[in-house]
Amino acid sequence: MSPDDIATCVGCGLCLPHCPTFRVTGEEALSPRGRIAIMKGVTEGLLELDADSVSFLDTCIQCRACEPACPSGVPYGRMIEGAKSDLANDGRVSPRWLRVGLRLLRHHRLLLWSRPFLALAQRLRLVPRRLGLPLLSWRNEEPLRGTTTEPDVWILTGCVMDAWQRRTHRSVAELAERVGLRHGVPSREGSCCGALHTHAGMHEESIELAERTMRSMPGEAPIIVDSAGCGAAMKEYGRLIGTAEARAFSERVVDAVEWLAGLMDSADTAALLAPTRPEKPTVVIQDPCHHRHVQKVHGATRRVLRDRATVIELTDDGLCCGAGGAYSTLHPRLAEDVRDRKVSAIDAAIDAARAGRHDIMVASANPGCSMFLAAAGLPMRHPVDIVRDTILPTDAEGNRP
């Protein structure tokens, strides 16, 4: 926690309406201003870091909605990451079970081998619904494989997305092939980007995984990432590691919808991505926080959907859904309170469109958000999957050949 960073906050409070935990509790200590005051008090020796103070800091979802709202440019994301790292090093946050679980993510085969056991646990109702895991089949889908060792683009496969949402990777690959691009996938070393570890305050592990990810996709080809949280983390490797190599790698990272929007705006590829079906799905856009507040590519979601879907906008100014990486497992009650506001906003938008949940789909470009909202009964889809299915064939039930 840098005193210089802390000093940038002037206490104006313009961040408060944008903070999900403040919105649902009304507690000053559960706002960015309140949490910065705790950081300031602790660093100046005026405040004891007791259990309450730790809890106030730990219950930040790290959505970073406060950053674009702040006229002083307070680097809140960097500050709360530093605070979480200090607390994690002291054993005050991120319990052992979470650390062990996150360390398993680097062992990708183990994650995939666990699928049948997790599928069985789901059917025995041993997996809490609030985790939002999709109902898993007994067998893993075929992994995405690269088409060349010298790709035009890389597609990050990662850990959670590759375990449970491989369909979206396939959508990215099929769209790349449609415009004539050869794709590569990371070597086994790049099985996890470290985003969840950063959220949990596991700073050293975050750096190690970032360096492994960088080694797994060498060269200068763009890196397409279809998980908003992963893309945000990888675009900040330059800040995390602080080397010219890391900054150059971050410059290569592009979110999948950002990449698609560029292709649709290019005269060379736009026609290849034109919709081939007359019917338009009705889509509610739910912006993941790391799309909207960190990467600032939420406009690209609208660009890729506007010509092929009837888009319904929410009126909640991009309020967080409450998922926050592993947040919903650590603070389920607060996460569900935040989610309830998001679900209410989505239902209100659906009602205003004179539709029902069965008539629409909710587009979200982050696996944590989509799984957490799916657990509340919402029909979730990745924007890239929606785009793919308006161009390439599916059967009457939406299955792909």
Language model region names:
Residues 7, 26-30, 197-204:
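Alpha-helix capping and helix-loop boundary segments enriched in small/acidic/polar residues
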Residues 1, 30-51, 294-305, 332-335:
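Short, charged low-complexity linear segments at domain edges
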Residues 8-11, 49-55, 59-62, 168, ...:
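Secondary-structure capping and boundary motifs in well-ordered enzyme cores
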Residues 1-7:
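Generic start-of-chain signal for non-secretory N-termini
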Residues 76-401:
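Iron-sulfur cluster-binding electron-transfer modules in prokaryotic oxidoreductases
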Residues 7-13, 17, 58-68, 191, ...:
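Cys/His-enriched microdomains
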Residues 40-55, 139-149:
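Active-site-flanking structural segment that lines cofactor/substrate pockets
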Residues 10, 14-38, 54, 59, ...:
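Iron-sulfur cluster-binding cysteine motifs and their immediate structural context
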